Amino acid sequence: MAISLLCLFLITFVSLTIVGCKIKRSIWNLPPSPPKLPVIGNLHQVGELPHRSFRRLAERTGHVMLLHLGFVPVTVISSREAAEEVLRTHDLDCCSRPNLVGSRLISRGFKDLNFTPYGEEWKERRRFLVGELFCSKKLQSFIYIKEVECNFLVKKLSESAVDQSPVDLSKTLFWLAASILFRVAFGQSFHESEFTDTDKIDELVFETETAQGSFTCSDFFPIAGLGWLVDWISGQHKRLNDVFLKLDALLQHVIDDHSNPGRSKDHKDIVDVMLDVMHKQGKDDSLRLTIDHIKGLLTNIIIAGIDTGALTMIWTMTELARNPEIMKKVQGEIRDRLGNNRERITKEDLDKVPFLNLVIKETFRLHPVAPLLLPRETMAHVKVQGYDIPPKRRILVNAWAIGRDPKLWTDPEEFKPERFIDSPVDYRGQHFELLPFGSGRRICPGMAMGMATLELGLLNLLYFFDWKLPDGMSHKDIDTEEAGTLTVVKKVHLKLVPVRVP
C-alpha cells in the first residue's frame, strides 16, 4: 500500500512538473537544455569530473545552459561574456549560496564565510576577515613565516638531492602549504608538533572538500524525503558525519590549546585574534562570533589556504616538467635576475621575475583550483545573454571551460605562458576569461595570502634546484589526469629528482 502511494505521488509530481515547465517555458525565455530522462533529468550525463561533462554538454547545447539535475534546475555558464553578466552586471542578485547538505554540515549551519547565503551576517564576517586577518599589516607579518618554511623546504630537498632520489612533489608541496597555514592560523610548526602526519591532514583536507562539493541525493531529490532516504541507505549521511567529526576534533584541539592560560601570547595568530574578538564582543556588536563561527571560518581558511598554494604549485611543476623548454626559460630568468650563490629567497625577489608570473597565469588558465568556482544562487530574476534565470536558481560558472575556450585562446590546450606577454588579462577578478579566485562580492578574500605562498614556493623550487625525471620516464609520460569535485587535484602524484644548483 505504501509503495503504491509513493509511486502515485511520484507520477503525479513528475506530471505536474512537466506541465509547469512547459508553462514557464512559454512565458520565459529559458536557456536551452540537452535531452533529459524522467525523474533523474540530466544526472546521467554528469561524470566524475563535472566541469568536463558540462563543457561537452555546452558545446552541443550553448554557453548558457539549463540542466535538470534530478528535480533541481541548474544554470551552467561557459563563456566569458555570460560570466561577466553573472559576476559583475548581476553580481548582487547572483551572489547567494544554495542550501546544500554537505556545505551546510561542514559550515555548521552556515556559520562560515564561503558557503553562507548572502546577507548581513555574511557581510559582517567578510568585513571582519578582510579587516582583521587579511589586511596589509597582517599579510606583511606572515611573510617571515613563509620565508622560514620555504628555507626548511630547500634544506629537506637538498638532502634528497644528495642521493638523487625521486621526491614526491605532490606530498612535498602539500606539506609546504599546510606548514605555512598551520603556523599562520594556529601558531604551530607543522614539522615540530603533533601535526606531523601529513598523510592524515592531506586526507582530511581532501575529504572535507569532497563533502562540501559532493553530489548528494538530498540536494537533487528534496521532495518527500526521497533523497534523504537514498543517502541514508547508501551511507552518505555516515560518510559526511565522519568527516565532520574528524574536522571538529582537529579544530577543538586547536581552540583548547589556544584557551590554555599558560600559553605564550607573544605572537598572536589567527585563532588568537578570533578568540579575543569573541571574548570582548558586546551584546550590541553587529558581528557575533561563537565557537562554531570560529570553527566555520577556520575551515574556510584551512581548505582554501592549503589548496590555492599546494594544488597550483603541483600543477605548475607538472606543466614545467612536461615542457622542459619553458622550465629552462623561467629558471634562466630567475637565476639571471637574482644572481648566483643566494642563500635564501625573500618577498622582495617576487617583483624581479615577470616570466614566472606569466607561468602562474597560464597554470591558472589550464588548472583553476575550483573549476566550477563555488555554486551561486539567484536572489531575483535576472537575464543573462537574453535568457531568463528565475530567483532561487543555482548557477555554476565553468571557469575551467572558459580557460580553454578556443574563441578566447590560441592553442587552448597547450601550455604557453608567452600568450600573456603584453596582455592586460589578470587573475584578480576583473577579466572574466581568467577566474581562479572568482569575482565580485564572492571573490576569495585570501587571494593575496595564497599568491604569496605560491610565488615564494615556486621561486625557491626553481632557483635552488634543477629537476630531472626518474629513470625510464620521458616528458610525455607525465599525465595530467584529474580527480576531485569541488577542487581538482593531480590524480597521479608528481615525482621528480631534485638536483641542487651550486
Curated annotation (Swiss-Prot):
Where primarily located?
Answer: membrane
Q: Does the keyword Calcium apply?
A: no
According to the lineage, what is the superkingdom? Eukaryota
Q: EC number(s) in its UniProt entry?
A: 1.14.-.-
Kindly list the places in or outside the cell where this protein is found, as annotated in its UniProt entry. Answer: Membrane
Q: Where are the transmembrane segments?
A: 1-21
Q: Pfam families from the xrefs? A: p450
The record, for Gene3D superfamilies, names: Cytochrome P450
Identify the GO cellular component terms for this protein.
Answer: membrane
The protein's GO terms of the molecular function aspect are: heme binding; iron ion binding; monooxygenase activity; oxidoreductase activity, acting on paired donors, with incorporation or reduction of molecular oxygen
* Entry membrane topology: Single-pass membrane protein
User: Which cofactors does the annotated protein need, by name?
Assistant: heme
UniProt keyword terms in alphabetical order? Heme, Iron, Membrane, Metal-binding, Monooxygenase, Oxidoreductase, Transmembrane, Transmembrane helix
Q: Which residues bind heme?
A: 444
Xref: InterPro entries: Cyt_P450, Cyt_P450_CS, Cyt_P450_E_grp-I, Cyt_P450_sf, Cytochrome_P450_71
Q: PANTHER family of this UniProt entry?
A: CYTOCHROME P450 71B11-RELATED, CYTOCHROME P450 71B16-RELATED
Family, as annotated:
Belongs to the cytochrome P450 family.
Instruction: Please report the name of this protein according to its UniProt entry.
Output: Cytochrome P450 71B17
Gene that this sequence comes from: CYP71B17
